[in-house]
Regions:
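Outer membrane beta-barrel
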Residues: 23-43, 58-177, 188, 197-200
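Outer-membrane beta-barrel proteins
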Residues: 45-49, 95-99, 130-133, 179-184, ...
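Detector for outer-membrane/organellar transmembrane beta-barrel domains
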Residues: 194-331, 335
Length: 336
């Protein structure tokens, strides 16, 4: 079957006023920092629907959107080989994002073992973000083609370990049980992920990773409602038959993926490509996703990013987006 490619164009222009960090306490053994940013963004309608900080958008017009992030981080020296660390970041409530309360992003405590790596416990990115994160550069504008984000861009209940040694970066994570993850009616029993990355002398970065989720089956239709859209496409059905979907509830989910990058984001030219494959138990088809972006950052504070995202399932394009964004971050000096 020949499938047409439906392309949605998302565009946004942003002006970011950022105070990256300020030290508010330091006694040589312990220190506490605060950080944050304020962003104003002009978006077309399609882009506004893809903003990560918008709860919902019901109209069909262009919009001016503001977003505020605030965070706090701390460190205490335990001994010459280890430090205790803590971190928390929130999305602040604003009139334009639909949230009337604080929304937690990353939040964890841990031990920084210096050359032995860092172990953290709490809410954050699992190890597979090493793969998907190379194209997660749009600040607020994200279409999230990869199924890694199906339950949100942050996960709670994570053990996370990171080690950099001998030219390689290793990340390992373990997911503990979470009920009704991201209000999806899906319960996670446990999960794990691992990723390995390296960068060549020419500036090319290569990474490969895999993640696994053990899913808890539910005996009620609420537990299967999350999967009905994919099942309709997979079996070419026209109705949301929850009883049918309930019989095909998956018991596990596996993501595999790779990424290739060139350069460093925010420093001149940056290029990135990643691809992922997702397998749900009891699904006869795999989900495939591809994202690619090109970014250039100028010394005067301007940057421009263009990217393409594709997600396919059962010979159907679930998503096909061309995204363009221009950004300006206020700098101490401005030269054109």
């Amino acid at each position: 079957m020949k499938t047409k490619l439906y392309l949605a164009i998302l565009s946004a222009t942003a002006c970011s006023f950022s105070a990256y960090s300020a030290n508010i306490y330091d006694n040589h053994e312990s220190k506490l920092d605060i950080f944050g940013d304020i962003t104003a963004m002009v978006c077309n309608d399609r882009a506004a629907r893809a903003l990560t900080s918008v709860k919902e958008k019901g109209n069909h017009d262009n919009t001016l959107h503001t977003a505020v992030n605030f965070g706090i981080s701390g460190k205490t020296i335990i001994n010459e080989h280890a430090d205790a660390v803590a971190f928390s970041e929130w999305m602040m409530p604003t009139d334009s994002n639909g949230f009337d309360e604080f929304k937690t992003k990353g939040q964890y405590v841990g031990i920084d073992g210096h050359q032995y790596g860092i172990l953290t416990l709490g809410r954050g990115d699992n190890a597979f973000y090493t793969i998907t994160g190379v194209t997660d550069v749009y600040n607020q504008l994200n279409t999230y083609a990869h199924d890694h984000y199906v339950w949100g861009d942050y996960q709670q209940g994570l053990f996370m370990y990171a080690l950099s040694a001998m030219g390689f970066d290793l990340r390992i994570s373990y997911q503990t049980a979470v009920d009704d993850v991201s209000d999806s009616n899906v319960d996670l029993k446990n999960g794990a992920a691992i990723a390995l990355a390296t960068t060549t002398s020419s500036g090319i970065g290569i990474a490969y990773g895999i993640s696994y989720y053990d899913l808890k089956k539910k005996d009620v239709t609420d537990g299967s409602a999350f999967y009905t859209d994919n099942l309709i496409k997979m079996y070419h059905r026209s109705d949301k038959d929850y009883a049918f979907a309930n019989a095909l509830q998956p018991s596990f989910k596996i993501d595999r993926g790779f990424s290739i990058t060139y350069g460093n984001f925010g420093d001149g030219l940056y290029l990135a490509l990643n691809g992922t494959q997702t397998k749900y138990d009891n699904f006869t088809n795999h989900l495939y996703a591809l994202e690619t972006i090109a970014n250039y950052h100028f010394e005067n504070g301007f940057s421009a990013t263009i990217g393409y995202s594709l997600k396919r399932f059962a010979d159907t394009n679930l998503l096909s987006d061309l995204t363009f964004g221009t950004y300006y971050q206020v700098m101490p000096t401005f030269n054109v």
